[in-house]
Amino acid sequence: FAPGTEDVSTPTTLQKQWIAFRAKVIHDFMEKAAAKVHSVNPDIRFGAYVGAWYSTYYTSGVNWASPKYDPAAAGYSWASKDYKEYGYADHCDFMFIGAYAAATSIWGKNEWTMQGFCSKAREKFKGDVPFAGGPDVGNPTGFQNGGQAAIMPDIVDACINAADGFFVFD
C-alpha cells in the first residue's frame, strides 16, 4: 500500500489475488444470504448498503458492482482479470449507495460529487439492480453543523435523477 494511504500504489499479482479473494468471500456470502432469504419468503426483498466510492472501496473487500462490469478493463490497476466475477449486484433486489460528498459537491460527473457517485453506480450496476443514492447529512464537509436545508432540493434532484430512488444517511 502507498505510504499513508489505504490504496495499492503499484499492485503486484499477489495483491490483486488477495483483493479478488476478499471480494469473493463477500460475494459468496451475499449469494448464499440472498438465496436463504428468498427460500424463506420469495416476496421479501434482499439488498445492501455500500459506499459509492468504488475506486477505493476494494480496500473494504467488497465488489458491489455487476459481474458484467469489468473494473480491470475500465483501468482500475488494483483489479485482477477475475475480480469482475465477484460483483454481487445481481444477487440483490435493491441497493443503497452512499453518495457522501461535501455539501458543496452536489453536481458533477465523477466520484466525490453526489450526482457523480449515483451516475457512476448506474454504470457499474449494468441494469442488474435498482438503487437509491443519497448523502450523509451529518459528517462530510459542510454538513457537520447542520443548516443545509436550502440545498436539499438540489441534493434530491442530483441523486434521484441519476438513481432510481433517494435516501438520507444522518
Language model regions located:
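Polysaccharide-binding and catalytic clefts of secreted carbohydrate-active enzymes
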Residues: F1-C92, G98-A103
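Substrate-binding cleft of secreted/luminal carbohydrate-active enzymes
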Residues: Y83-D170
